[in-house]
Amino acid sequence: MITIKKKEIVKLEAVLHLYQAVGWTNYTHQPEMLEQALSHSLVIYVALDGDAVVGLIRLVGDGFSSVFVQDLIVLPSYQRQGIGSSLMKEALEITKMLIKSSW
């Protein structure tokens, strides 16, 4: 069963395989850049199959008037199962709360 969890801290080792699996070489060739990007994200949700991270959505922005989906990744073997949609739904809910609380 897949669960979606908001993560305050995401370790590089836990998610680097996602970027490798989908061929996002900018981060895989420069993992320190990904580590910095993760630590400066507004919100990160991960999709878990047990303890294994199989998907991720990363939001960036000022958290006041703008929030963007920077990364939405699901392992190829888990795609077409609604995981990306579930991650996006969580992101939309938190975005509504962030923007609403700022107005």
Feature annotation, model-predicted:
Residues L75:
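Residue-level recognition of the GNAT/N-acetyltransferase active site
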Residues Y78, G82-L87:
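Conserved acetyl-CoA pyrophosphate-binding loop and the N-cap/start of the following alpha-helix
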Residues M88, I94-W103:
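Conserved GNAT acetyl-CoA-binding A-motif
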